A protein has these predicted regions:
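Catalytic cores of nucleic-acid ligases and guanylyltransferases
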Residues: 1-265
Length: 265
């Protein structure tokens, strides 16, 4: 790998610090895929996960497509995604591609789960380090390098106002948006920066608490709530909810739940 690519940790998003309307930012879909840094050197392409683990063999068709880019060397950042029957990015459907290790398993996963590499940044090209350039300039160069709607595509974005994109994500039950400062350089991780901020869609629904299960360690007294929902008048089990419960909430639940017990019959 090149000096820049060696041990590279991709730029990471902060979890707060941006608004949906900001003339200094552009807005992209928050993808439900897997982060991949791709390096092209001559006719060779190397793909790496965010943690540096090699991914070239897992997505060989993407590597082949990148090898055809009309430039001797380039370093790109993006996400590999697959789509469900409704055309939405699906991490669950992508999982077999991520976890397959043996050559036969990789081939089977490739045949059953087609993927696309959606590129949103260009870190280097033609022997030139581009990380110090403003994001909008890097994207301008990227759009000239990657064209069309094949296996490798540029992720679209909207400038100044991300509210319509956010509303679309919420309506379609997508992950949310990423708000990026137009003039920001590419800041190599692992430190998170408010130059890029995730704005996740909040989702809510009504459920009936059916009971709870014990946890482990500090959460031994209450690990998760068991919840259900009414479907055509019938109460159906929907699963467990445990994340997001603070210690204070758990204490309150343990105090109140016994008084709500009912006999099943």
């Amino acid at each position: 790998p090149s000096d820049l690519a060696q041990g590279l940790t991709p730029m990471l998003c902060a979890l707060e610090g941006a608004n949906l309307v900001d003339a200094e930012r552009l807005y992209e879909l928050k993808l439900d895929g897997v982060r991949i840094v791709a390096e092209k050197r001559g006719g060779q392409v190397a793909l790496r996960y965010r943690n540096g683990r090699a991914a070239t063999a897992s997505y060989a068709e993407v590597a082949r497509a990148l090898s055809l880019l009309p430039v001797d060397d380039a370093l790109l950042d993006g996400e590999i995604v697959t789509f469900d029957a409704e055309g939405k990015p699906s991490f669950e459907r992508l999982a077999p591609r991520i976890h397959a290790q043996r050559p036969l398993d990789i081939e089977l996963a490739r045949a059953n789960v087609p993927v696309v590499y959606l590129v949103f940044d260009l870190l280097a090209m033609g022997g030139r380090d581009l990380t110090g350039l403003p994001l909008v300039e890097r994207k301008r160069i990227l759009a000239q390098l990657v064209r069309g709607r094949g296996l490798v595509r540029v992720l679209d974005h909207i400038e100044d106002d991300g509210s319509l994109l956010y509303d679309f994500c919420k309506r379609e039950r997508l992950e949310g948006v990423v708000a990026k400062k137009k003039l920001s350089p590419y800041r190599v991780g692992p430190r998170r920066t408010t130059d890029w901020v995730k704005i996740k869609c909040e989702r809510d629904d009504d459920f009936v608490v059916l009971g709870y299960v014990e946890g482990i360690g500090a959460r031994k007294s209450l690990g998760a709530l068991c919840v259900g929902a009414y479907v055509q008048g019938q109460l159906q089990y929907r699963g467990r909810v445990g994340s997001g419960l603070s210690d204070a909430t758990i204490r309150l639940l343990l105090k109140e739940l016994p008084a709500l017990e009912q006999e099943l019959g």
